[in-house]
Amino acid sequence: MKKNRAFQTVVLLLFVAVQASAQKTGIPLVYSVENTGAKYDAPRFATPSQLPSVSTLPNPFVFSDGKKEVKKFKQWMKRRAEIAQEIQHYEIGQKPSVPMDSIDARMNGDTLIVDVRMNGEVLTLKTPIFYPQEGTAPYPLMIGASNNSLPAKLFKDRNIAMMVFFERQVNNYSQFGRPSGRGNYEFDRLYPDLTENGAYSEWAWGFSRLLDGLQKLGPEVTKIDMKRIGVTGCSYAGKMALFCGAFDERVALTIAQEPGGGGAAAWRVSRTLGNVENLDKTDYNWFKHSLKENFGEEKVDNLPYDHHELVALCCPRALLLLGNPDYEWLADPSMYVSANAALKVWEKFGIEDRFGYSIVAQHGHCQLPPSQYPEVEAFLDKFLLGKTDANTLVRIAPADYPQRYDVRPWMAW
């Protein structure tokens, strides 16, 4: 069992030093707006044929024009905005901003109802909030993307409220049943010109509208603390949770459970593995069709970013990645490489305790084993409950990963 969990670089003295350093940085844990990068112009988007081939993971600190590199945290905020724009442009489609005067919100008992009014159309989101039986409002909140696959006990024991984002209210695509089809989803009524979008941009948009509703009503009405909101999900919803957390800076903590390819795993690395979800073998209802056309097979090296940079969009906020190497399709070796590359961003600003990964075997898909409870509990305690002494320096992977999947050749920076 120790070998299956082994490779955890947590040293008490280092932990204490990092805690002290992180507390002195003054770098925010969360923001009060969806997108701090809205003030920056989008970078110039090269056509796919104009993009250079880069076989290693692109340097997340180098700006899109290749002329500047991030040296200070303030520069990261602009670079972060560039990465977000690139992912939307080449991969998932546009996530439109919505002015607050287009949001109407109300509570019906414990159910949050949000009406989004755009282009003469109205889209309504409804979801109940499950409040703690004890504790004092305003409460921290964990939102499950599609559902909450993590054990409810972890939240109930900590007086954390729970909610589910029902993504079908925005885009009802599913690998089962009969979805409406691209161009015919609820989102498309409001944005008929964005039918090239993949589901992940639209789901991230809908998730943000729930946060708009909570923010507009305020804690006096919702009993929710907007500074202590988390999002989680597993499998395809693990990807969803990652996109939601990455693209909304009001999220203090993202826990992406077994997100697989198209989530935290890097497209470039996944292409070198076996039977895994990669850019050529994924569900293109989730992404722009042009992603495969422009970057399939060896052309993946032309992507101006990779998913270590999607992961890094969460910085400076908190992120925990959970993996399960028993399922080859999930491409956890690729997530391991991607996670260690992304970690460099948090490390650069002295806040590496805000990012962790735990890749543990011997359990079912989306079934968090008791052996992973401590990692989840630590992140909940620190980033939703404010317990600064919680140990979140989590770096757990199978014992053979460091040698078999050496991160260094992937990072030429």
Region locations from a protein language model:
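Bacterial Sec-dependent N-terminal signal peptides
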Residues: 1-25
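Alpha/beta-hydrolase-fold serine-hydrolase catalytic core, especially in secreted/extracellular enzymes
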Residues: 23-126, 131-137, 315-317, 324-413
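Cap/lid segment of the alpha/beta-hydrolase catalytic domain
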Residues: 144-227, 260-263, 267-269
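Gly/Ala-rich beta-loop-alpha elbow adjacent to hydrolase catalytic centers
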Residues: 233-237, 241
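Conserved hydrolase catalytic core segment
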Residues: 247-252
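Mobile cap/lid helix-loop segments that gate and shape the active-site cleft of serine hydrolases
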Residues: 256-310, 331-339, 347-352
